[in-house]
């Protein structure tokens, strides 16, 4: 026997395959304040015990592999391994379990959402022993969150920048999302902004297409912003989408927006990637730009109840990576979103400290230790009749974004925006007077119609429009 073989044998190395649970299932483990904690919803294959499945998740997302390797003896597995420390069955679901996994902080690069996700939601999601796997929540300890810059500015600084307080902000996505020339696009922006809007927005897939190159769009939109500001005396903005095919091109677009003096730009953070998003967020803080985030591709990742990543995790990741706004669903519009679940991740975006609350899908207490908050953006199939519910659900620190609910007004863009602004002001005033918007909302809107023909026309157009479908992703 060679000396090397003798050394390995003496160290206790034995080739072969061991059950994961012998090493990675540790129900006696007491979690540390510095651990990153994860809650996985797992569906094991028939015949796979939940303890083995949970241990496999912990192993494959940290230090483990499918067989014993002699190089395990060159490190300290007890220090670096992930641990499945608890498993509970999912009520009302057959063969589904919540596996709780603790990860030592040293497994992750500081300030990198990319590295965090590569480990925790990497190869393990294709593991054959699992029929399905979903990451429901993460607990990010202060020791890790403090390594991130977070949002470029946060909503408190944003309010100071645009000098608007005491109400939700109003936005509008320009429609049709594709096909307008740059000049006509700028015209639509101007009509909306002069009518009472705070922001207008590029849609997520508006980048630099043959019918409208990005530089032309930026120029005509900047002209529209300055003209609307001069007429209204209010600070206005448009989310100029800087998303591009390369990071270098993305930064070029951000720099041009800064040169034009506009207040805010935009990024598609999931399709663009976390590395690109974090780089852009750093640029925005250094150069005084607000950053609006669109979540295009989110439903591909989070809509199925038993597999993928829940949006509350993607929301936490965005807060660390950086963004001042992010689309969060509406509860009442055309997009998926159950009320309590939505309010749970809205609080995770905005608040400093959020208590564990399983009724809202929050599996862990989260302390952001003064990281700036992100404004949730309610967007997708909303119109003036939704305004009372949106005001009550999201409160002042939010952006209410009407696309078709502005541009679909029978009298045009500016009257559409007037209708939304009047409806919002009426709801905020009624709330401040102590009225119950959940019960009296429709009456508040009807009263406001007496003073605004634009609102009355909008109410008539959309009085029958509802999106009443069962929510797929429930607790």
Swiss-Prot record:
Annotated compartments: Plastid, Chloroplast
Key words, A-Z: Acetylation, Calvin cycle, Carbon dioxide fixation, Chloroplast, Disulfide bond, Lyase, Magnesium, Metal-binding, Methylation, Monooxygenase, Oxidoreductase, Photorespiration, Photosynthesis, Plastid
Cofactor(s) demanded: Mg(2+)
Co-factor: note: Binds 1 Mg(2+) ion per subunit.
EC number: 4.1.1.39
Modified sites of kind N-acetylproline: 3
Single GO MF descriptor: monooxygenase activity
Binding site for Mg(2+): 201, 203-204
Site (Transition state stabilizer): 334
Top-rank taxon: Eukaryota
Family from the record: Belongs to the RuBisCO large chain family. Type I subfamily.
Function: RuBisCO catalyzes two reactions: the carboxylation of D-ribulose 1,5-bisphosphate, the primary event in carbon dioxide fixation, as well as the oxidative fragmentation of the pentose substrate in the photorespiration process. Both reactions occur simultaneously and in competition at the same active site.
Subunit annotation: Heterohexadecamer of 8 large chains and 8 small chains; disulfide-linked. The disulfide link is formed within the large subunit homodimers.
Protein name: Ribulose bisphosphate carboxylase large chain
The organism of origin for this protein: Spirogyra maxima
Lineage: Eukaryota, Viridiplantae, Streptophyta, Zygnematophyceae, Zygnematophycidae
GN (gene name): rbcL
């Amino acid at each position: 026997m060679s000396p090397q073989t003798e050394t390995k044998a003496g160290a206790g190395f034995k080739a072969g395959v061991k059950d994961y649970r012998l090493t990675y299932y540790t129900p006696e483990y007491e979690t540390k304040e510095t651990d990153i904690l994860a809650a996985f919803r797992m569906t094991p294959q028939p015949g796979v015990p939940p303890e083995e499945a949970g241990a496999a998740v912990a192993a494959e997302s940290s230090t483990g592999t499918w067989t014993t390797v002699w190089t395990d003896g060159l490190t300290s597995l007890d220090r670096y391994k992930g641990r499945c420390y608890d498993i509970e069955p999912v009520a009302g679901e057959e063969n589904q379990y919540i596996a709780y996994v603790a990860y030592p902080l040293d497994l992750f690069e500081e300030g990198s959402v990319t590295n965090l996700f590569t480990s925790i939601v990497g190869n393990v999601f294709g593991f054959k022993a699992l029929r399905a796997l979903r990451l429901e929540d993460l607990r990010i300890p202060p020791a890790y969150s403090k390594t991130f810059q977070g949002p470029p500015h946060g909503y408190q600084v944003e309010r100071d920048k645009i000098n608007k307080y005491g109400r939700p902000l109003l936005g509008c996505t320009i429609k049709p999302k594709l096909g307008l020339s740059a000049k006509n696009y700028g015209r639509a922006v101007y009509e909306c902004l002069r009518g009472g809007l705070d922001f207008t927005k590029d849609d997520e897939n508006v980048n630099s297409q043959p019918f409208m190159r990005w530089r032309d769009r930026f120029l005509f939109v900047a002209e529209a912003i300055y003209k609307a500001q001069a007429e209204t005396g209010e600070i206005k903005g448009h989310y100029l989408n800087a998303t591009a095919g390369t990071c270098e091109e993305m930064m070029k677009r951000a720099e041009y927006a800064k040169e034009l003096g506009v207040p805010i730009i935009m990024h598609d953070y999931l399709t663009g990637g976390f590395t690109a998003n974090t780089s852009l967020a750093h640029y925005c803080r250094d150069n005084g730009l607000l950053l609006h985030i669109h979540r295009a591709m989110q439903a591909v990742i989070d809509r199925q109840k038993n597999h993928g990543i829940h949006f509350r995790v993607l929301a936490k990741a965005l807060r660390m990576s950086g963004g001042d706004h992010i689309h969060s669903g509406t509860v009442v519009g055309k997009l998926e979103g159950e009320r309590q679940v939505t309010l749970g991740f809205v609080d995770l975006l905005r608040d400093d400290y959020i208590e564990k609350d399983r009724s809202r899908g929050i599996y862990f207490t989260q302390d952001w230790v003064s990281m700036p908050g992100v404004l949730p953006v309610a967007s997708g199939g909303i119109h003036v009749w939704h305004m009372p519910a949106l005001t009550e659900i999201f409160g002042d620190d939010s952006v209410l974004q009407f696309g078709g609910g502005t541009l679909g007004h029978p009298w045009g863009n500016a009257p559409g925006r007037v209708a939304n602004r009047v409806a919002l002001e009426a709801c905020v005033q009624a709330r401040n007077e102590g009225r119950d918007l959940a019960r009296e909302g429709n009456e508040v809107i009807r009263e406001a119609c007496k003073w605004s023909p634009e609102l009355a026309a909008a109410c008539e157009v959309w009085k029958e429009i509802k999106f009443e479908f069962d929510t797929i992703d429930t607790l």
